[in-house]
Amino acid sequence: MLSKASLPVFLLVLLGIASCKKVAETDPNNPPANPANKIAPDGFNYITTKDVTVSITALTNRNKAISGVPVSIYSLNKGVRGQLIFKGVTNAQGVLDAKASMSAYMDTVVVDANYLGLIQNVLVTTSDNTLNCTIGGANGYSGNIVGVLQSNGGPANAANVIRSAASSNGGMVSMDINGVKTNTKFSYLGTYNSNGRPNNLETPGDEIGVDMLNTINASLPEQKKVPDVHPEYIANDATTNINVREDAEVWITFVHEGAGYRNALGFYTYDTKTPPTSLADITEINFIYPNASLKGSSGEMVSGDKVKLGTFKAGTTIGLVLFQNAWNGKDVSVGATALFSDANLNPEPNSDLRKHNVFLQYKNTFLIGFEDIRRDYSGCDQDFI
């Protein structure tokens, strides 16, 4: 009997405003003769700022403290992130306790934890001059968080929808990719809920520990271009796929996403000895995460969500494919741009720009990060998360 190896795979993607008070220009014991000319009623409060007690906690998905997380608080200005109000770092207990001065009218602000693995740009209400929230934790976030600042990813692609009935136990649908005739068959690995979160999640999910998160953040610093800081990650000889060397069960675990799009993630397989040379060689794609978006950020995924891909024979290669902004609120639209872990299948005319994922190793786990925008487009940040 062949032994089976467990091959887990993780996916990854200060300003104080001075208060203003009116100064009396006359002797308070000798008021003006014409009080009718006063510009405000008695008791009017001219104070325009307030001091807010801030308590922000950063936790892993198993509620363990994350220290050293940079946290910024911004004003909310017409639905977008405005002026920086305060900046700080969580302590050894994963807590940022501080006082922040902000405009008196502000009842909702933007709190951004610049740390992969934690939801970013959350909307937090202030109540009784306190701002209290937890970023991370088993549910993704808690406290006075009322939502997430939504970036404008545009509407999902509506072409070539794969209906939910086309699941692994309900048949397949044959369609094309990136406008190329392929007759590729699409299906879902399992059913999913109304927000595109798979129903076939493993219980319990995986713990995403502090050490792993720190490694991810050090390896893939957000808003840093991978070609500049780690060109070796996308070198021609860099691994981008999962090559099964002995019979193995394979799982994939969601860690983080920082996309403005509602992306769908799928996988395909082929014999390692005969890699695909064109899109027509991709005969079948199974969707793992119909909507790979975090809870509160146009989705319902939480860090640690784990799905079993299946059992694979030695000599099999597993490739990943991301369909850009393909979740339409109900199904996946495969008319969207598809970006593959096999770089030669990607649409950029310049072959030097075709790699769209990085493949790193952490202990016995592989970490995968995807760039979800065509790399020849000006809007691509090239951070691969």
Spell out what each predicted region is:
Residues 1-8:
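Bacterial N-terminal signal peptides that target proteins for export
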Residues 7, 13-44:
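Bacterial Sec-dependent N-terminal signal peptides
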Residues 8, 17-18, 62, 260:
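N-terminal processing/targeting junctions
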